[in-house]
Structures are given as structure tokens and as C-alpha cells.
């Protein structure tokens, strides 16, 4: 069997693609990847040899575009979907699995036009525009946030490095794969207070702010573990006892898998405020704290860091997600629904 995996744009979407690829390989399913020249798709998968083939199309997002540009983008997407249909024919694609993001649009529409099963994984608590549009036509729609809960695909390495946290010795600041200026500034402002408490700092700051953050820590004579980006983030997480993080869905569930207590600062400009609702999923279970970016008081924030019951939260995070989530999605989509697959 050969399937197409499509979608991306950001690290969160692409992490799911990688999990699905690894699970498909276990079942001897070959995968063709269809992504975009824009975003992070090529950086993640251009050299990924486990795909049967990879295609990076000229797809682009429509968020914040004018009405005319949105129409133009839609017409371009329809043109690219025709190219995808040719890819489906050439590689005998039997089903399409979308993880969302604008780079999923051409192949997803092509699946509908070609009468192929379309499976969609929605990573966020608030569905993106493309997934909302396609959901009624999908063969199966998966979400970790809906009533019929599906496991969120998280790489095994985050579970393998999990441990119960009991004492705050190390704190990690996570701004996402591209860094977050606000979280970087927060980390630098908190650094002297953390040093007074003998709390060590691990800081993912992104490429743009790396030199600035490095020099600031040096000026404070603080030995922070600072890095711009890491493909082995689980190695950094396992050394931390608390995380300060944005609330992208993949990051959130990776933190859960690692049983790492977290204070979330949702990105305030995320579409439909989905990062806040992602974090609220945990807050409603008393499993995290949320601070809104525009109302943070440094002293109050620091007090919250020291007050968290790390052991209680870390222990209960074990029940939020489960290992082999991607395996379950592949099983549900392609084997429990064999009548859909020609």
C-alpha cells in the first residue's frame, strides 16, 4: 500500500508527519510526502530518505491576505491539486493523510477530486480554516481535543525520557522552533531571580535572538544552557523540572509525554486564539498554569514558578497522552476502515 502524507508549514504539523511516517513504515506502508516550498517543510524533509518520494509545491497561506489575493491563492491551489492528481496516479496512491496547514490544501482537494479516502488530523483545540472546510468530506477526522478523542502523535523519545519531577533545580524556556521574543525577554529578566534560588536555566531562543541572549547571560555571569534550535529537544527537556512555553499543540503534548510541568504563555496572535484553548485543555484539569502575555507581572510570575506542586502535576500528566499514538491513527485510518481503501 502507498499513501500520501501532506501538510506542514510549522514544526508542530511536521512533527506529526514524521510520527505518521515512522508508524506507516512499521506496517510496510510506503509514503509519498507532499508539502510546500514555503515554511519549514523542505528543512525537515528534503533529506528524509524514508519517503518513497517528496514533492515541495508552490503552495502558500491565505491568512491576512486581501480578498483578491485569497481568490488568487485558491485558483493556484486548484491548479496545484491537478498536479497532485498526477502524483497520485504515478505512485498509485490509495489514501491521503493530512495534518493541516496551508501546504496540505492541494493534496487534500486532489484526494476529494480523485475519490480517494482523506484522513485528517487536527492538532489544535480550534480547527484551522482548511480542516474546518474539509472536515465534512473527510473519511475520518482525528483530534485529541474532541469528544471522540484520538491519541496525539508524539515521538517515542519524549516518553522514553519522562520522569516525575519533585524539586525545581532546572527550568527550560521554550519559544517554539523559531524562538519567541517575548519569552526570550522574560527569561533574561527572570535570570537574576532564578540564580538567587540556585535554579539553572535551559533556554531555546531561536536563531534571531541567539547572540543577544548569549551576551546577556554572559554579562550577568550566568551559565545558561542556551541554544537556538535542537532536533533532540527531549534531551533538553529531560534535564528540566519546569517549562515556560508557548502552547502549540505538538509542544504541549510533547511536554505531557515527558511529564514536564509547564507554565504556558500562549502566542496572542495565533489563529482563533488556538494556543490559549490548547493550554486551557490542561488548565481545566489543574495540570498547568496560563499567563497571558499582555498582563504578566514579573514578581507575580516568579512567585507562581516557586509555588507549583511539581510532583503532583508531573504524576498526573502521565494520564494525558499515550505512547504509539501515531500507530493507533494509522491503524484506525487504514486497517479498521479497510472498506474505504481500494
Swiss-Prot record:
InterPro entries in the cross-refs: GlcNAc_MurG (IPR006009), Glyco_trans_28_C (IPR007235), GlycoTrans_28_N (IPR004276)
Any one annotated GO CC term: plasma membrane
Swiss-Prot/TrEMBL GO biological process terms: carbohydrate metabolic process; cell division; cell wall organization; lipid glycosylation; peptidoglycan biosynthetic process; regulation of cell shape
Molecular function GO terms recorded: UDP-N-acetyl-D-glucosamine:N-acetylmuramoyl-L-alanyl-D-glutamyl-meso-2,6-diaminopimelyl-D-alanyl-D-alanine-diphosphoundecaprenol 4-beta-N-acetylglucosaminlytransferase activity; undecaprenyldiphospho-muramoylpentapeptide beta-N-acetylglucosaminyltransferase activity
Cross-referenced Gene3D superfamilies: Glycogen Phosphorylase B
Biological pathway: Cell wall biogenesis; peptidoglycan biosynthesis
Entry membrane topology: Peripheral membrane protein
Annotated compartments: Cell inner membrane
First-level EC class: transferase
Cross-referenced SUPFAM superfamilies: UDP-Glycosyltransferase/glycogen phosphorylase
Positions of UDP-N-acetyl-alpha-D-glucosamine binding: 10-12, 124, 177, 275
Top-level taxon of origin: Bacteria
Reaction(s) this enzyme catalyzes, per UniProt: di-trans,octa-cis-undecaprenyl diphospho-N-acetyl-alpha-D-muramoyl-L-alanyl-D-glutamyl-meso-2,6-diaminopimeloyl-D-alanyl-D-alanine + UDP-N-acetyl-alpha-D-glucosamine = di-trans,octa-cis-undecaprenyl diphospho-[N-acetyl-alpha-D-glucosaminyl-(1->4)]-N-acetyl-alpha-D-muramoyl-L-alanyl-D-glutamyl-meso-2,6-diaminopimeloyl-D-alanyl-D-alanine + UDP + H(+)
EC numbers for this chain: 2.4.1.227
Keyword line: Cell cycle, Cell division, Cell inner membrane, Cell membrane, Cell shape, Cell wall biogenesis/degradation, Glycosyltransferase, Membrane, Peptidoglycan synthesis, Transferase
Family annotation (NCBIfam families): murG (TIGR01133)
Annotated function: Cell wall formation. Catalyzes the transfer of a GlcNAc subunit on undecaprenyl-pyrophosphoryl-MurNAc-pentapeptide (lipid intermediate I) to form undecaprenyl-pyrophosphoryl-MurNAc-(pentapeptide)GlcNAc (lipid intermediate II).
Family: Belongs to the glycosyltransferase 28 family. MurG subfamily.
Name of the molecule in the record: UDP-N-acetylglucosamine--N-acetylmuramyl-(pentapeptide) pyrophosphoryl-undecaprenol N-acetylglucosamine transferase
Organism (species): Campylobacter jejuni subsp. jejuni serotype O:2 (strain ATCC 700819 / NCTC 11168)
Gene: murG
Amino acid at each position: 500500500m502507498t499513501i500520501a502524507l501532506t501538510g506542514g508549514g510549522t514544526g508542530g504539523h511536521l512533527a506529526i508527519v514524521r510520527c505518521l511516517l515512522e508508524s506507516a513504515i512499521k506496517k510496510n506502508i510506503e509514503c509519498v510526502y507532499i508539502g510546500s516550498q514555503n515554511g519549514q517543510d523542505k528543512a525537515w524533509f528534503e533529506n528524509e530518505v524514508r519517503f518513497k518520494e517528496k514533492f515541495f509545491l508552490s503552495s502558500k497561506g491565505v491568512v491576512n491576505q486581501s480578498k483578491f489575493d485569497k481568490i488568487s491563492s485558491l485558483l493556484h491551489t486548484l491548479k496545484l491539486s491537478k498536479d497532485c492528481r498526477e502524483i497520485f496516479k504515478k505512485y498509485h496512491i490509495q489514501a491521503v493523510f493530512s495534518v493541516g496547514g496551508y501546504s496540505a490544501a492541494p493534496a487534500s482537494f486532489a484526494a476529494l477530486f480523485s475519490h480517494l479516502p482523506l484522513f485528517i488530523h487536527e492538532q489544535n483545540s480550534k480547527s484551522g480554516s482548511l480542516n474546518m472546510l474539509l472536515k465534512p468530506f473527510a473519511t475520518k477526522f482525528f483530534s485529541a481535543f474532541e469528544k471522540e478523542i484520538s491519541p496525539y502523535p508524539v515521538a517515542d523519545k519524549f516518553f522514553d525520557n519522562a520522569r516525575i519531577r519533585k524539586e525545581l533545580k532546572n527550568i527550560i524556556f521554550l519559544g517554539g522552533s523559531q524562538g519567541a521574543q517575548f519569552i526570550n525577554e522574560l527569561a533574561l529578566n527572570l535570570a537574576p531571580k532564578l540564580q538567587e534560588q540556585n535554579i539553572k536555566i535551559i533556554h531555546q531562543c531561536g536563531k534571531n535572538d541567539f547572540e543577544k541572549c548569549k551576551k546577556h547571560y554572559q554579562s550577568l555571569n550566568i551559565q545558561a544552557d542556551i541554544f537556538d534550535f535542537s532536533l533532540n529537544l527531549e534531551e533538553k527537556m529531560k534535564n528540566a523540572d519546569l517549562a515556560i512555553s508557548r502552547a502549540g499543540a505538538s509542544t504541549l503534548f510533547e511536554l505531557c509525554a515527558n511529564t514536564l510541568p509547564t507554565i504556558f504563555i500562549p502566542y496572542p496572535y495565533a489563529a482563533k486564539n488556538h494556543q490559549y484553548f490548547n493550554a486551557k485543555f490542561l488548565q481545566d484539569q489543574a495540570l498547568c498554569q496560563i499567563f497571558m502575555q499582555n498582563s504578566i507581572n514579573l514578581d507575580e510570575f516568579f512567585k507562581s514558578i516557586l509555588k507549583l506542586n511539581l510532583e503532583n502535576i508531573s504524576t498526573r500528566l502521565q494520564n494525558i497522552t499515550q505512547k504509539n499514538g501515531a500507530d493507533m491513527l494509522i491503524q484506525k485510518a487504514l486497517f479498521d476502515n479497510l472498506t474505504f481503501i481500494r
